[in-house]
Curated annotation (Swiss-Prot):
Its EC number is 2.7.7.6. One of its GO terms (cellular component) is DNA-directed RNA polymerase complex. HAMAP family: RNApol_bact_RpoB (MF_01321). This is DNA-directed RNA polymerase subunit beta. It comes from the Bacteria. DNA-dependent RNA polymerase catalyzes the transcription of DNA into RNA using the four ribonucleoside triphosphates as substrates. The gene is rpoB. GO terms for molecular function: DNA binding; DNA-directed RNA polymerase activity; ribonucleoside binding. Belongs to the RNA polymerase beta chain family. Signal peptide: none annotated.
Amino acid sequence: MPPLIESVVLQPLIAPIDPGADGRRSRRIERRSFARIKDAIDLPLLIETQLKSFEWFKREGLRELFDEISPITDFTGKNLELHFRDYTFGEPRYDEFECRERDLTYAAPLRVRVELRILTTGEIKESEIFLGDFPIMTDNGTFVYNGAERVVVSQLIRSPGVYFKDEKEPTSGRSLHTAKLIPNRGAWLEFETNKRDVISVKVDRKRKIPVTILLRAITAWIAEENGNGRWVPDNELDKFGHNDQIIELFRHVDTVPEHPYIHATLDKDPSRNAKEALLELYKRLRPGDPPTLENARSLIESLLFSPRRYDLAKVGRYKLNKNLWERDVRRDGAKAPDLSVRVLLPRDIFRIVEQLILLNNGHGRPDDIDHLGNRRVRTVGELIQQQFRVGLLRLERVVKERMSLQDPASATPNGLINIRPVVAAMREFFGGSQLSQFMDQTNPLAELTNKRRLSALGPGGLSRDRAGFEVRDVHHSHYGRICPVETPEGPNIGLIGTMSTFARVNEMGFLETPYRKVYNSVDNVQVWKEKGILLRDVRDLRTGDLIAAKGTRVNDEIARQITIGLLRGQILREDIVDPDTDELIAEAGTEINRALAERIVELPIKHIKIRPVVSQEVDYLSADEEDRFVIVQANAPLDQHNRFLDTIVSCRFGEDFVSERVERVDYMDVSPKQVVSVSTSLIPFLEHDDANRALMGSNMQRQAVPLLRPDAPIVGTGMEYRAARDSGQVIVARRDGVVVSTTSERIVIEEDDGNQTEYRLRKFMRSNQDTCINQRPAVVRGQRVKAGDVIADSSSTDQGELALGQNVLVAYMPWEGGNFEDAILVSERLVREDIFTSIHIEKYEVEARDTKLGPEEITRDIPNVGQESLRNLDERGIIYIGAEVQPNDILVGKITPKGETDLTAEERLLRAIFGEKAREVKDSSLRVPNGVRGKVIDVKVFSRSEGAELPVGVNQTVRVLLCQKRKISAGDKMAGRHGNKGVVSRVLPIEDMPFLPDGRPVDIILNPIGVPSRMNIGQILETHLGWAAARLGFRVATPVFDGAHEDQIKDLLVQAGLPADGKVTLYDGRTGERFDNPVTVGYAYMLKLAHLVEDKIHARSTGPYSLVTQQPLGGKAQFGGQRFGEMEVWALEAYGAAYTLQEMLTVKSDDVVGRVKTYEAIVKGEPIQEAGVPESFKVLIKELQSLGLSVEVLSADEKPVELSDDLDSDIGALEGINLSGMERGEF
C-alpha cells in the first residue's frame, strides 16, 4: 500500500459571527488572490447603463418630445394652438411586490400641463392632462409588466452619418466609391459612381438621378448657420446652378483629366439652372404629379431641410462633421456646423460629393462599417422615447382632426386630447417589441447578463437571415467594449453580444472603455495659462493626490503649482538647457526635486520631456478616439513609481499589435479583465481555454439552476462578489447603519442619522424560468453594515458571492465506458446529501368566465368525480396548501354550463311543477399535467366581487404554485465553467466509486479524453488548485489573464502535502484493487444546468391527432408522439421487419379506422385485424388525380377499391370510441 494521504475536509472557511458581536463588520468570504496587477479603477455599477438611461428619459427625453410636438395647430394654423408645458410623474399605485403578485404593471401616472390658445380671441385655457400610467424601472433595472419582470435590451445599430464604401467595378477592377447619408429620421441619400465617371444620387431610395440636378437645386437654398433657411425669389432662380458655378465648386478636387467626374455628370444632366433642376427633381421623385415650382420647393425642403421631417440627431451631426469637416483633405478654413444643427446644409452635400471624388482619385480611405466608431447603442431610454414619439404623433393627428371639427370658442384641452394612441404605443413596445424581453431569471448571473446585453436585431437593426460574416465577427474596436467571447451559439452568433466589464455608453451612444493616461512630457506654465479653465482634475503623478480641481480658473500662481506638482519626483528624458543663455540646467536622467522644478518653471520651454510615467488619471475613450493613440496592455511591468521597466513594450495601435518604445505610449489598460464580459471574467484560468469552449462556459453559467445549499467556488476569479451584488437578486444596504432586527422575512437597519429602514425579503418566489428565488438574511442583530454591503443572500449566492454550483471531488479517468462521449458518472452521495438538489416552482392558473350559456363556477361539486379525487380540495373546490399531488389530480374544481338538453314531455311537466331548470354542466377543472408531481406551496384567489382587477369576462382567477424538489439523476445535464459539459449517465453507489488511498470516494468521474481535443486546460488547473486550496483551508481568486501560474500551483500542492503533479493512485470501489496509472484528482466547481431530464422525458400511447393530416401531434406540450422518420424506416427495411413497418405507417399513424379497431382489439384481448388505408395514401391518390393522371386502387383480383373520402363518415362508423382523450376538434 502507498503512504496514506490525510483526508481532505472542507472546513467552514469563515468563522460564523457571534450574535452578540456588536459593531462587527459584514461577513465576506476572504480569498487569497494570485493577481499581480491591481485594477486602476473600481468596477462601475454593472447595471448603470439601464438606470442612467431611464433617468435621462424621465428628465430630458420626455421634455425633448413635448418640445418637438409643441405647438399643435389646426389645419389652417389660424384658430387653435396646443402647447405641452411641464410634466410630472405621480406615485405608483402598487409597489413592485404587489404588482408581481397581482399580475399588474409597476407604473406611475404621467400628468402634463397643457395650454390651449384660441388665436382669434387671444384666450388661453390651461389644464392638467393624464397621459396614462407609465411603466417605471425598478432599482434593479427591470420593468414589472403584467406581473412578469422584463428587461429592455440595448440595441447596437449603425450610427446616423455619412459612410463611404469602396466597390470594385467588375470588368476593369477599378475602385468606384459610394456614399450613404443616413439620418436618424428622414430620407436617405445614396451617391454612386459608375464606370463612365457619372456620379448619381438616389433620394429616399427612389430612381437614380445625376447628382448635379440635386446640386443645382440646392444652390438656390440659402441656409443660415443655425440650420434655418429660405429659397431665393422665383425671379432670381435662373441665376443659380449654372454649369460654370457647379464646375467652380469642385475645381480643386476634380483634377484628374482621365476621370472628369463633374463634366461627365453634367453631360447626363438635362437641366441648365436651379429652376429647371427643381422641376426635373420633382418629376423624378413624384412621377405623375404636375411639376410646379411651389411643389418642387416644398418637397425638397420637407425631404432635406425641415426639422419636423428630417433629423440627423446630435450624433448624426457629430459623425457628419467628423467625416466631412475634420478629414485632413483640404484646408480651406471652412468651419464645421454646430452640433445643434440637426438638418442638412447644402454645404454638407457639396462636401460629400467632394469627398467622393477625392476617394475615387485615390485620396483618403473608405469607412469600416463594422468599426464601433460607426455603430452606436440605443439604450432603454432612447428606445422608449422613440416609441413614445410614435404615440405622440398619432395623438397629434387626432388633435388636429378634432380641432377642425370643434368650435374654437368651446374647445378645451381635455376635449381635444385622446390618450389612447400613447397608451397603445407603450403597450405595443413593452408587450411586443423584440427588444423588450422576458427577463432570464434562472440565476443572478443570467439576470445581470440580460441587462448588459447588446442586440443588433430588432426594429431598425439587422435580420439574422441577411447578416453576413463580417458583421458577426470580432473587430479590433471591440477591445474593452464588447466581449469577444460571450455570444450565443446558433443563428444569433455575433449579432447578440455583451458589454465588457468596464465599458460604458457615452451621451452620443458610443461605447467607451477606460485607459490610464501615460505622461511622456509635462506642459509648462504658459501652456496651462492658455487653457484658461481646467476641464479635469489635475493629480500628482506619483501619489494621485489632487493638485487642482476641475473648473479651476488658471492664473500664474495656479499654473506654477500645477507644473511643479507634476514635475516633482519625475526623471528627465533629455537635457534641460536655458534657451536664452544655453546654460545646461539639468542632464537627462536627473530626478526632479522641488528646487529644480521651480527653476524649470521659469524657463521659456513649452513642454518638459520626462521618462514615461503611468498616472492615476483615467480617460474614457470611444472606438474612433482610441484609434489615434498607442495603448499598452495592463501587464506591462512597472516599478513602484509607475514607470516602465522595459524600453520597448507590446502595444495596440488601431488594428495592429506592435512593439513600441515607451516614449510613444499614450495610454495603458486599466485592468487585464477589461476585454471580457462579467460572465467570461468568472471563468478561472480563462487564458488556458480555447475560445470556443470559453464561449460555451460563459453561456452555460447562465443556465445553472440554483441549488438547495449554495456554495461559493473554492477557485474563483474575484468577480463573484460584484456579479452577485449588482445582479439585483441580493439585497444591498442603502446607507451605513446597525442591524436592529432580522427575521426570515425582513431586516431592519437603524441608519446613522437615526432613521430605520425595513428591507423585505423574497421568500420562495417563482422566477420567470420556474426556478426558486429565496432570500436569506446574511447579517445578524447588532452587526454594523456599510452602504453597498450585501445584507441578504439569494438562491445562488453564498455570503454575498455568486454560487452557481458545488465544489466536488472529481477524478479524470475512464470507467467501464460509463463516461463515454462526455457522459458523467456521479456518486450517490450527491443524491443522498442533496448536493445537487434544486427547487422548482410551477404556476397553474384557472379562470372562471362568463360564457354564452351562463357563468363558469369554481366548486367542489363536480359531476362524475369520486370522493377520492376531491380529498385534497377545500369547501370552495380549491386545493389546500401543503397537499402532495400526482399527475391528473384536481387542483381547482370548475364546472362549465353545457346548455339546455331537449326534454321529454314528462320531464317538462315535472320541471314546470317543481321549478327546477334542467341544467347540464361539464367538468373543466384544473388538473396536474402529465409527468408533474409536487407539493402545493401557495394558492391565490382573485375575485371581481372583492375588487380585483381582472380581464373582461373573468369573474374569478385562482393561481396555484406547485413546488418540486429535484435531485440529480441520470439524464440531467452538468457542466464546469470551461465549456466541459456532459449528461449524467449513471448514479453509482458510493461503495462502487473509485477511492483515494485514505478511503475517501470521489464524487464525479469525468472522461480525460474530453480534454485534449477541446483544448480547455483551465479545468485541469482548476482541479489541481482546488485540491490544494481545499486542503489548506482557504479559497482563492485567480483573475482572468492575471491568474496563478503552474509553478505556484505546484508549490501549493507540495505545501498541502499532495503530489506535485496532482495525480494519485486510485482504488476500484468494487474490487479494492488499485488502478494501473495515477489519476488526476481534485476539487472542481460543477454546475447543474436547466436542461433537466424530468422536463424532457415523455411517453405516449394514444393522444391527440392533427385534424388536417390525422397524424399524431408532436412535442411534449401537445402530448405528441415520436417522429418515425425516413432513416428509421430504412432501418426496419434493412431488417425486413415488414409487420412492424406496416404498423408504423398505418395504425400507429394516420389509418383512422384501423387505429381505433386495433385499440379496441387490444382492450378486448382479441387478435388485431389487418390495417386499413392510411390517410396520407388517399392524399397521394388525390394529388396524382389532380395532375390529370387516372390513378385508382385495384384489389388482388384487379377490381377497383372504393376509398372513402369522408373522414366524418369513417369516424361515425366507430361508435364513439375516442382515442385522443380530448374532445374532437380541440386540435
